[in-house]
């Protein structure tokens, strides 16, 4: 079952948002 372009794009977008949120949360906790 191959992934469609939409599913791949959605997965990358979600991973990007999650990374940004975790990075901001980490910097706030570090301060």
Curated annotation (Swiss-Prot):
UniProt keywords, alphabetically: Chloroplast, Membrane, Photosynthesis, Photosystem I, Plastid, Thylakoid, Transmembrane, Transmembrane helix
> Where does the protein end up?
Plastid, Chloroplast thylakoid membrane
Q: What is this protein called?
A: Photosystem I reaction center subunit XII
How does this protein lie in the membrane? Single-pass membrane protein
Gene Ontology terms, cellular component aspect? chloroplast thylakoid membrane; photosystem I
Per its UniProt record, what Pfam families does this chain match?
PsaM (PF07465)
User: Transmembrane stretches, by residue range?
Assistant: 10-27
List, alphabetically, the InterPro entries matched.
PSI_PsaM (IPR010010), PSI_PsaM_sf (IPR037279)
Task: Give a GO biological-process term.
Answer: photosynthesis
Q: Which family does it belong to?
A: Belongs to the PsaM family.
- Superkingdom per UniProt: Eukaryota
